[in-house]
Amino acid sequence: MASRAPLELLPLNRSQLSPPNATTCDDAPEAWDLLHRVLPSVIIIICVCGLLGNLLVLAVLLRPRRRLNVAEMYLANLAASDLVFVLGLPFWAANISNQFRWPFGGLLCRLVNGVIKANLFISIFLVVAISRDRYRALVHPMATRRRRQARATCVLIWVAGSLLSVPTFLFRSIEAVPELNNDSACVLLHPPGAWHVARMVELNVLGFLLPLAAIVFFNCHILASLRGRPEVRGARCGGPPDGRTTALILTFVAAFLVCWTPYHFFAFLEFLTQVQVVRGCFWENFKDLGLQYASFFAFINSCLNPVIYVFVGRLFRTRVWDLFKQCAPRRPPAVSWSHRKRVLQLFWQN
């Protein structure tokens, strides 16, 4: 059975297009019809919220005459990554609304999916860097945290994410898919061989399991070091800035893991079906639909971070208000009644 998911997070490769002697499965038409009708609108809402929210975060963090600290530097890069990511979502929404028939040509097929794939790696690598920075600040407070090192780390993360998305740029193309009545779809045409294993190692191991191990290590040590500290209990009600920053970072990490873990579970399940460790129509349908819905659940993370800023970051709310006052048109100074009276007297005297 061919996959119904031709975009990058949900790849379709050459061996899946027309499998010989494949068993025909009932592919849950009601569930797919619901997906085609509902999810494009949901994606557009996510795109608009993510665009406005991340622009607000960048506007606050990158205000003129203000130097970013190390944590803010990582958070600004995370907002920039999410912003680039949501710019590609309208193409995805149109593709799903069109029942996976790609109408935008080969260049955008590669570009949109490459950006999505790069963001997957850049986001989780930045979460690792953010967790490591909090770990050094709280567990090893005497260690130096230099802005130059943070800038170099951010550049390295963007380069690494871009390099890991190179296979997407190389192997994405427009292909006539029999399961779509030979209409054109944006598919991932992997070369023959052990590519399934290579992709699983890249996506699930480099893109999730290894970063997850680092995130768990850093945050477990952070929680252990904060246990019993009064600033943790006061972090949400005016406690010391260090405690509030830690609460913000931990909320970011928790939201990221909650949003992205289901996708990686279904991506690994797809690998098991591709190598035929897991077989049967139930698992095919479960995997295909699960990948779609888990992907959109992961999309929510790109517009969730600004919400976390507003509700958890008290200092961020203060800076938003300062930015609003700076940008809002200034009202003319109020004129006292005595001044008005003098003006009227001069007017009538003349």
Curated annotation (Swiss-Prot):
A lipid is attached at C327 (S-palmitoyl cysteine). Pfam families: 7tm_1. Glycans are attached at N13, N21, N95, N182. Residues 1-41, 94-110, 172-204, 270-292 are extracellular. It is found in: Cell membrane. Its main location: membrane. The chain crosses the membrane at residues 42-62, 73-93, 111-131, 151-171, 205-225, 249-269, 293-313. GO terms for molecular function: bradykinin receptor activity; peptide binding. One of its GO terms (biological process) is response to mechanical stimulus. The keyword Glycoprotein applies. InterPro entries: Brdyknn_1_rcpt, Brdyknn_rcpt, CCR1-9-like, GPCR_Rhodpsn, GPCR_Rhodpsn_7TM. It is a multi-pass membrane protein. Residues 63-72, 132-150, 226-248, 314-350 are cytoplasmic. GO terms for cellular component: plasma membrane. Disulfide bonds join C109-C186. Keywords: Cell membrane, Disulfide bond, G-protein coupled receptor, Glycoprotein, Lipoprotein, Membrane, Palmitate, Receptor, Transducer, Transmembrane, Transmembrane helix. This is a receptor for bradykinin. Could be a factor in chronic pain and inflammation. Belongs to the G-protein coupled receptor 1 family. Bradykinin receptor subfamily. BDKRB1 sub-subfamily. This is B1 bradykinin receptor. It comes from Canis lupus familiaris (Dog). The gene is BDKRB1.
